[in-house]
């Protein structure tokens, strides 16, 4: 049975004073450690700081402050959620990705640090052609909270992007995140991956579900019990969504355009073969910080006689933008071009 933490978890002898902020942090960390959580001190610091509205430095400075009973009860309630293996990001309702503070909820996957490898690989491909300042067209398949798309748009000042998802609730979260980070060049579309998109696109990115169906039950409780299963389950061998991408994306890419996908452990060779079979040209996968092959880049062949570089037609030409301009993104759009749809 999962250990419970109530207000009494912070209780001291009746003759003693109430707990200080620092003592409460230590009490939480001890409980988290006893429960086998991976980062007990960090989780305790974040949860106490979140409730008190204090950043790391301010929390340390407030260590001697006494908690009143109401504060102790509220912090204990947060601790109980974490002991039930609810991820800290879900308790807070937000997660930082690419230095962006993004809202997450039950409809969205919590973005992982290793997914930033996809952003890095996409930007490296764009930089190799000197195209970062161009009016690129980007699609993010299965956008969830919008992490990949919004990270790219913050780095590409003239790019336009569209994120797709089958969950309208997730699209609303992504739309709100776009508003929050000022990404007015984002659009969101209800679509099963690329099914409802109209091309051409210069860059397409995706972090598809890639866990084999039979392996989902063995995932950590923080993932298995709180991330949407539709964002995890990649079919019997974990490759169903890569097959769907291979079947649709080549027709949506401009000649010379790039596809970048996240990989599960051990999937690089199989996914590269799927993409090669439809005429894309894969590059060696990019490793994440743990050395695991995590991002795979595959390009659509350039037209015969096309010179190297996006400027020669592989990417959208430089365009003047205005607040009145729109971009045709297909059907069922939630928001488009320079204006995020109404709340």
What residue spans do the PLM features occupy?
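Conserved AdoMet
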Residues: 3, 41, 48-125
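Short, intrinsically disordered C-terminal tails of secreted or membrane-associated proteins
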Residues: 332-342
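Non-catalytic accessory regions of SAM-dependent methyltransferases
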Residues: 1-59, 64-67
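Conserved SAM/SAH cofactor-binding pocket of Class I
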Residues: 114-218
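Conserved Class I SAM-dependent methyltransferase catalytic core
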Residues: 236-299
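Residue-level signal for inorganic ion chemistry
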Residues: 47, 85, 115, 148, ...
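Mobile active-site "lid"/loop adjacent to the S-adenosyl-L-methionine
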Residues: 210-240
């Amino acid at each position: 049975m999962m250990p419970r933490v109530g207000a009494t978890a912070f209780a001291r002898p009746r003759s003693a004073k109430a707990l200080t902020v620092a003592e409460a942090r230590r009490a939480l960390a001890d409980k988290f450690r006893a429960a086998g959580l991976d980062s007990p001190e960090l989780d305790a610091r974040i949860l106490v700081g979140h409730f008190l509205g204090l950043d790391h430095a301010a929390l340390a400075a407030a260590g001697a402050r006494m908690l009143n009973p109401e504060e102790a009860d509220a912090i204990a309630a947060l601790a109980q959620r974490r002991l039930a293996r609810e991820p800290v990001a879900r308790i807070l309702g937000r997660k930082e990705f690419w230095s962006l503070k993004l809202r997450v909820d039950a409809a969205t996957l919590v973005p992982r640090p290793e997914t930033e490898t996809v952003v890095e690989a996409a930007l490296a491909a764009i930089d190799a052609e000197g195209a970062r300042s161009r009016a690129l067209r980007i699609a993010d398949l299965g956008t969830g909270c919008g992490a990949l798309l919004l990270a790219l748009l913050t780095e590409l000042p003239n790019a336009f992007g569209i994120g797709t998802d089958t969950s309208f609730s997730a699209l609303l979260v992504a739309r709100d995140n776009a508003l929050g980070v000022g990404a007015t060049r984002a659009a969101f579309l209800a679509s099963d991956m690329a099914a409802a998109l109209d091309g051409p696109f210069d860059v397409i990115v995706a972090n598809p579900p890639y866990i084999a169906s039979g392996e989902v039950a063995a995932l950590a409780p923080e993932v298995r019990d709180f991330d949407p299963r539709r964002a995890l389950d990649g079919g019997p061998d974990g490759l169903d969504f890569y097959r769907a991408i291979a079947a649709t994306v080549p027709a949506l890419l401009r000649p010379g355009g790039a596809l970048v996908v996240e990989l599960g452990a051990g999937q690089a060779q199989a996914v590269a073969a799927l993409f090669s079979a439809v005429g894309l040209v894969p590059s060696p996968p990019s490793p994440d910080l743990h050395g695991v092959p995590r991002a795979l880049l595959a390009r659509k062949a350039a037209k015969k006689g096309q010179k190297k570089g996006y400027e020669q037609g592989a990417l959208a030409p430089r365009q003047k933008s205005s607040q009145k301009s729109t971009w045709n993104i297909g059907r069922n759009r939630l928001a488009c071009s320079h204006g995020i749809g109404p709340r």
